Design a protein with these regions (language model features):
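A gly/Pro-rich, aromatic-decorated transmembrane alpha-helix motif that marks the paired
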Residues: 65-69, 128-141, 170
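Loop-to-transmembrane helix entry/capping segments in MFS-fold secondary transporters
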Residues: 16-17, 82-83, 108, 113-122
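Symmetry-related core transmembrane helices of the 12-TM Major Facilitator Superfamily/SLC fold
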Residues: 55-58, 148-173
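Cytoplasmic membrane-interface "Motif A"-like loop-to-helix N-cap segments
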Residues: 42-60
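C-terminal ends and interior cores of transmembrane alpha-helices
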Residues: 2-3, 55-77
Length: 183
């Protein structure tokens, strides 16, 4: 059934790939890249948690920069190449692999055992709040696009992610001190 649907879609003169088809990319990149990232953390190149977070945020910024570049000069009726969409998923997934497992690991290492379930819930509540903020900011795309262009919208997010990455890395000594040598 799926083969028939794909075949009939691509035999048309003009073909359009549904956005929903790209949702599999995150899972694909997690499965294919997780072991490589894990190998980095278990080798001699195991940076501190702040640097892992910072690098993860830099990869998120890089993903937004790719889309910023792809969206430069596009008018409203034009569509971006799927290569840019694949690249943003690639870089954001690497960023996710640098941030999410490390964050969960350090929640379990740093929180007193009696508060562990509560803090994991707080971690996921933070993710839910971030999703709500992202939806609210995403609603601003029309007003920003009208005034500055679509590429500027992505450039703003790249700047925020890169700035947060720099900030986290600058606070590395403070975070190490607060973690009391937990590795």
């Amino acid at each position: 059934m799926a083969i028939y649907a794909i075949r009939s879609e691509f035999l048309k003169k003009t073909s359009e790939i549904a956005v929903s088809w790209f949702s599999v990319l995150n899972a694909f990149f997690v499965i294919t890249l997780a072991s490589s990232v894990s190998k980095i953390w278990s080798s001699k190149y195991n940076p501190s948690v702040a640097f892992k977070y910072g690098f993860g945020l830099f990869f998120v910024a890089l993903g937004y920069l790719v889309v910023w570049f792809g969206a430069k000069g596009l008018s409203e009726d034009m569509k971006i190449s799927m290569a840019y969409i694949i690249l943003i998923y690639f870089f954001h997934t690497i960023g996710e692999l640098f941030i999410s497992p490390v964050g969960l690991s350090y929640v379990s290492k740093l929180v007193p055992h009696r508060m562990l379930a509560f803090m994991f819930g707080t971690w996921y509540l933070g993710i839910a709040i971030a999703q709500k903020v992202a939806a609210t900011l995403g609603g601003q795309v029309v007003s920003i696009t009208k005034e500055y262009g679509l590429s500027t919208f992505f450039l703003i997010f790249a700047g925020i992610a890169a700035g947060a990455g720099i900030l986290v890395m600058l606070y590395n000594p403070v975070l190490k001190k607060l973690m009391h040598e937990v590795k």
